[in-house]
Amino acid sequence: VVSFSNIAYSDTFYGVGDSTTGTYADWMKTVYNRAGMPELLSIPLTTFDKDYNLVPMAAESWSQSDDGLTWTFKLRDGLVWSDGPALKASDYIFALTRAVTTGFDFGWYYSFAAGIKNWNAVSDGSKDVSELGIRAVDDLTIEVTTESVKPYLPGVFSLWFPVAEHAWKKHGDE
């Protein structure tokens, strides 16, 4: 057992990890070299508790359409990035639209496991990213359309981490 009780509180988190560029805004480039940092720096839509039950994280709730092809995720209000702006549905959309258009090496996960509509066609350039089956309905609502019924989709999204679009526009991979 490791105890951190003798370590003084700090507003700064220091951690050891590995990255493709030395920053962690690039985690959507390669999942295999991200060293678990997204889990420390951002929050997925869902997660699993110690008994492997699916539980909410950023999403306070989710529902599936009657035909099983559309999922709606409602984000918890009041979540913010460390620099102050609110976490928005568009930050999750930005993460996946960036992934699908940059050759993300874990793309099969969102294509096969998640079955996101048009993932492969957008990834290979035969369809525009605007046709990807994800959208921000409003600041707190994400809608996902799948190619086929995926009853386990909320569990798949335990690995969907947002990217702060406002920070990305300012800093990029740097």
Language-model segments: residues:
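Extracytoplasmic/secreted proteins, especially bacterial periplasmic and envelope-associated proteins
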Residues: 36, 40, 53, 57, ...
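Short, well-ordered beta-strand elements
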Residues: 2-4, 11-20, 70-73, 92-95, ...
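N-terminal lobe/hinge region of extracytoplasmic solute-binding protein
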Residues: 16-66, 97
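Second-shell loop/turn segments in exported
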Residues: 27-32, 75-83, 130-132
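Extracytoplasmic
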Residues: 10-12, 40, 57-59, 66-70, ...
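Aromatic- and charge-enriched surface segment that lines or borders ligand/interaction sites
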Residues: 60-108, 143
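Surface-exposed binding/hinge segments that line
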Residues: 74, 91, 100-101, 105-169
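Solvent-exposed loop/turn segments at secondary-structure junctions
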Residues: 20-23, 52, 78-80, 99, ...
